[in-house]
């Protein structure tokens, strides 16, 4: 059988929703946002190298010219799809970079938890982070699915593991919590050091006494995972070959979830506890001088993915002055919702402005948020 291959992404996905979306629409959109990161087809004209840290320490990943890849690479930078698309040719699907070979750890690619967080962030504004640990529950906008017990006083990662939670609640209780998983919910385990998202509502099979059958009951998952050097796993789904390390259609029986000590997690928006809100970006500052642009605050209710500032001359020629990417860590610190050029990029920005020829310009900023929308919260005339 001859399989089709994924096609290049021909336009930027935008995850806007109507004024009063249903919870189901939120969930479906979160699944799609994460899946777009896992299934984008790409190639490279030069070797791209990654060196892994953390859970996959010491492994080097190589992406070779002429090879078709699918999905963002596993990388510690943990940035959104829109950062990747900054280097992506939508006509050919090829990534382009400066240099002979590129070490991309700094900003391109994602981890399992980062992928889940950015998928959720397309519709959820309550998150401040997603981590592969137990103590994130009710701490970063992450909530439990079901009523399993956990200790909210635990603040250190190794003090309380998901295996302990499963054992303390018991298999029957955890099965009942797994049974409440809906598409868009996540699972996390400190045993496997992994986080995934369900793409279906749990399929639950009970015996004649109402007890859940752990082998027949299951969820189906998607995830961002790490490859092994030049060996990339291949998966067929819907007639497509996905030549990368993540999974997009992984069958997980409840018995397996229990064995691997997964606990189910979700967000307030996906549970209908707080309302959906349209994305907005504003600029807190006068924004009529370069100094005010540098010192002002870009604010958003959703995580920002990147900010670009431009100088546009009278002929409409646009010069990029500076670019700032935001990663999962920036979401956790709050910088992805409140950012000042003066805090990180003042010197580079001022150097770029100094290089502009004399003339009349419009200085402006474009902000991309996790919904995919692009806002221009500040624009003003500038004479040099």
Question: Where do the model's predicted regions map?
Answer:
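Short beta-strand elements
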Residues: 372-384
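...with weaker cross-activation on analogous glycine-rich loops/strands in unrelated enzymes
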Residues: 127-228
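N-terminal capping segments
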Residues: 2-125
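Extended low-complexity, serine/threonine- and proline-enriched intrinsically disordered segments
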Residues: 299-324
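Short, compositionally biased P/S/T/A/G/V-rich stretches that sit at domain boundaries
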Residues: 261-293
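Surface-exposed, short loops/turns at beta-strand junctions within beta-sandwich domains
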Residues: 352-359
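Active-site signature of cysteine proteases
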Residues: 200-273
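Solvent-exposed serine/threonine-rich low-complexity stretches and specific carbohydrate-binding patches
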Residues: 319-342
